[in-house]
Amino acid sequence: MTMQTDILTGRSAIGPALWRVRVLIGLVALHFLGVYTACLLLGHPFGSGTASTLISLLQVQIPLFLVILLFWRFGWMIVKIRPKRPTAWFANDLRETLLDRDRILTGIFAFLAMCLFAGSFTVGKDLIPLINPFSWDPTFAWLDRALHGGTDPWVLLYKITGTPAITTAINAAYHLWLMLAYFLIFVACFNVSRHDKHRRYLVADVLCWVIGGNILATLFASVGPVYYEAFGYGADFVPLMDTLRGFSEISPVWALDLQDMLLDGYLNDGPMRGISAMPSMHVASTVTMTLYAFSVSRAYGWIMTGFAALILMGSVQLGWHYAIDGYLSIALSLCCWALARRLLRAFA
């Protein structure tokens, strides 16, 4: 009888859990159908090697996230709670979290939705040159110079940050971005049932990637300074790339290997071939993370503001993007953050 009751209770909890993330699931489902339809129309297989790589990286990092959260909660207990019996309090807190059926179920559904979205997004990104061949780079390069007094932004930036050590540090922050993005998504998913700010972050993040990483990236198809010469636009950014290669002989510049891998994948139809510059999704997603951080704590928000500034610098410093890519991305993120709030209120 007890087992039967548990099963019925579990089933009754599934409906409310799905309902809490209905906006997120709806957006992901619409995006999935849109990309799948595009694949059918273009005769392109619905699959991407990038998606499997991203999911594999996430699987490896989940145990680390759990350890980080355990240490964070323990530190919170020591600094803020200060119970008379720390061990008993911590054990009880952990037990309550693990037995919170609504929280766990809602988190699982949200997390699965985000994983599905990662897959369909990367497929959509691979479709960009099939729908709209890359052509906007000369325009964006010209706009960059026009906005910065006739000089390429990377030249201005390198007057301040143009050393091998600083470039390595910025590159490290740029690579840390993926782990941080995964971590915040994981945290938000398993806190959705506790506060709307977590739900808002997930919805805003999906909107940002769909509108920016798929729709705008297709409309303004571009490859970025790093591939400017390879795609036949001229040697304008050869000095930038030569400088980075020179730096790499003194201090690591890991971006160069990834850039070569993506170009090789694009030219030879490899598993990793998602090239796209406008807008910068590194910048857009980091600004969204920053807005989320501010909704949790002003201190977290200012820390993330500094990180967002590093990502914006890195997008130009490492040759991935034109400065204008980042500027548009900031505006995009702010708009998606506001739109997420409206959507959640509309379907409240």
Q: Where are the regions that the model predicts?
A:
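Membrane-interfacial, low-structure loops and terminal tails that flank and connect transmembrane helices
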Residues: 2-18, 80-104, 348
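Aromatic-anchored segments of alpha-helical transmembrane domains
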Residues: 31-39, 209-215, 308-317
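Juxtamembrane "helix-exit" motif on the non-cytosolic side of transmembrane helices
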Residues: 36-49
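Alpha-helical transmembrane segments of polytopic membrane proteins
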Residues: 53-68, 109-110, 171-175
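Intramembrane catalytic core of multi-pass membrane enzymes that act on lipidic substrates
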Residues: 94-173
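Interfacial segments of alpha-helical transmembrane regions
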Residues: 107-111, 186-220, 226-240
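Membrane-interfacial catalytic/cofactor-binding modules of polytopic membrane enzymes
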Residues: 218-295
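Membrane-embedded catalytic cores of phosphoryl/pyrophosphoryl-handling enzymes
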Residues: 260-348
